[in-house]
Amino acid sequence: MRAHEILNNPFLNKGTAFTMKERQELGLIGLLPPTVQTIEEQAEQTYEQYLTKPSDLEKRHFLMEIFNTNRTLFYYLFNKHIVEFNPVVYDPTIADTIENYSHLFVDPQYAAYLDINHPENITETLKNAAGDREIRLIVVTDAEGILGIGDWGTQGVDISVGKLMIYTAAAGIDPASVLPVVIDAGTNRKELLEDHLYLGNHQERIYGDQYYSFVDQFVETAESIFPKLYLHWEDFGRSNAATILNNYKTKIPTFNDDIQGTGIVVLGGIFGSLDITGEKLTDQVYLCYGGGSAGAGIAGRVHAEMVSEGLSEEEAYKHFFMIDQQGLLFDDMEDLTPAQKPFAKKRADYKDAGDMTDLLNVVKTVKPTILVGTSTNPGAFTKEVVEAMCANTERPVIFPISNPTKKMETTAEQVIEWSDGKAFVATGVPSGTISYKGVDYQIGQANNSLIYPGLGLGMLASEAKLLTDEMIGAAAHSLSGLVDPGKPGAPVLPPFEFVADVSIKVAEAVAKKAQEQGLTESKETDMAKAVRDLKWYPEY
């Protein structure tokens, strides 16, 4: 490999940290300033530049320049400032870069761009993108349901890139072993189709047999090329997400973050709340506000946990209610998704069914103790709704977890104030600490970043053949043991600043459960050791 190729390869490049011996051996003499820096000095210099950027969007652009030139330095810096950088590198700032991707495009970032019109190119595309790297983890999106901002076509590749950044920063998954993938199946966003600078296919989305055939071919090819692959589905539309997951979850090690990941972290937050009150999950009434992939997935996860705690499936479903655009879901509605149908009620059981299009009326009628918002409908959790929740139970669980910030159902501060500090709160974006009547309430972030990195690390370390419900349950339980139930105002989820420790605990729980179920192919029998041995550190 030639000198300039090394300097242009982000997996190999050290920049000014190449030693004199390395510069001599690699033909780099005279191509770098004479001073040899440590990674600490490089990070100090880079962070100083970062602080000069006036907006989060410009800060993200700067950090992506580092990412594109030196992965090790990028992750060293990210680990050092993980709480500060997370909302810049990922949600919410990434939404702005996705919306402007075609106009800001500079570097493909070793992503694989799959074109639904050319299935014959899948093999070549994946091999070209991977090069000589052994890929263990793929995050793939078709970008139909990005981060509450909708359909962004090829531009959604940034969500795959961003997700993998969190995998590495939080759990130490080797960045050379990951591959971001986007399936360009078209887009229904008119502004993209009419933009001559849009870099994706200028066609409306393709659905049905052609779409599923392409996905099948992608999965088969990826599994063939990368035999130890863990496949993560991200931000697929509600019409396809559950179908795809159900097609593959009993065949390969795979995971859908929107359907499963959010459910795990919300369940962990519920466990954290119930640890404080001493109540049982099977005594709760759950209201899902927003019946898309995330909302239905969370409800499904909590339902599965109720069943594991002793209820029959039918008994457990009686504890659940779901509201979507048409109001409370009834089984006579024609447009229910497969994921929504189990939660739909019989209209005849509710004499005021016609009034069940309003959240407040539903809360007063079905008397939930848990309210989770995934609607992206800002302001939906009004003061009256919060007060009605408090009338149902002494300490309600209220999680407005829609993101980005402008899509939240309410703010944590409003929930604390309107509930007089009684409600347990977690939000989908960082909310910090809220002082109310002398108590500092630390607001947990129901951020999937607490769960999916560790889950992935556990899957890779154990070389698990499948991701089972039991392994997912183990991940959720591992979260709940990390909060302090005796501290007033304590968060119901561990703060993101501890995500590295959280990820190790989640990984160990998942790997050990896989081992118990006889699903591991790793030669290592000590799963805690397997997890620690696999963890990658950003060092030269």
Swiss-Prot record:
Keyword terms: Lyase, Manganese, Metal-binding, NAD
Query: Which is one GO molecular function term here?
Result: malolactic enzyme activity
Q: What is its EC number?
A: 4.1.1.101
Give coiled-coil spans as residue ranges: none
Q: Which InterPro entries match?
A: Aminoacid_DH-like_N_sf, Malic_enzyme_CS, Malic_N_dom, Malic_N_dom_sf, Malic_NAD-bd, Malic_OxRdtase, Malolactic_enz, NAD(P)-bd_dom_sf
Identify the residues that bind Mn(2+): 234-235, 258
Instruction: Report the domain of life of the source organism.
Output: Bacteria
Which residues of the sequence carry a binding annotation for NAD(+)? 291-294, 403, 448
Q: Which cofactor does it need?
A: Mn(2+); NAD(+)
The UniProt family comment states: Belongs to the malic enzymes family.
What role is this protein assigned? Involved in the malolactic fermentation (MLF) of wine, which results in a natural decrease in acidity and favorable changes in wine flavors. Catalyzes the decarboxylation of L-malate to L-lactate.
Quaternary form? Homodimer.
* Protein name as annotated: Malolactic enzyme
Q: Which organism is it from?
A: Lactococcus lactis subsp. lactis (strain IL1403)
What is the name of the gene encoding this protein?
Answer: mleS
